[in-house]
Amino acid sequence: SFMYTGKYLWIYGRKNMKLFGGNFKELFDYLEEKSLNNQMFGIDFRCLFLNPNSDEVKHAHKQQDIFLPELKATIKRAKYQIGDNQLLQKCFRMYSNRREEIIIRLDNCIIYAKPHFDENGYPQLMTDTKFEIFSASSPRGQECIRKFSNIWNEAINLF
């Protein structure tokens, strides 16, 4: 069985697509169990998706014929997985801004990567791209937390 003993799990970047690829059912079962408590036992889970109706979706991936259907399918899988759990529904939002970085917060660690863009402004594939890990309490960590929080506050509810 899955046990997450940390407090923070925030995702801003396409890793949300991997989250709903089928390999994380135990995580969502665990979150479902924790959601029986109004405060989720202190777990702060947040996941941001690109809004498929935003203008930015046209610039998010050079293969639009693949990206947009994948994004919509992932959102459908998320909605199916979360169902009518209103507490977990609040953990998901959609942003419309251009994503210039990947920020994942896992407790007191920040996993950070900056996509490279081609000459047309499309992000290049992130496979084998280097990433950095630093403390959430470091100056860079605090900057990432501020950026994530600002995007979260501007985003609209997924459900």
Language-model regions, residue ranges each:
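Generic structural signal for residues in well-ordered beta-strands
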Residues: 90-92
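Primarily the HKD phosphodiesterase
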Residues: 2-83
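A broadly tuned preference for mixed-charge, low-complexity surface segments
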Residues: 62-70, 102, 152-159
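Short, small/polar residue-rich loop motifs at catalytic or cofactor-binding pockets
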Residues: 96-99
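Short, well-ordered, mixed-charge alpha-helical segments that flank or form enzyme active sites
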Residues: 19, 101-103
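Signature of lipid phosphatidyltransferase scaffolds
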Residues: 113-159
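Non-catalytic C-terminal interaction segments of nucleic acid-processing enzymes
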Residues: 86-88
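Short hydrophobic-aromatic micro-motifs
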Residues: 103-106, 110-114
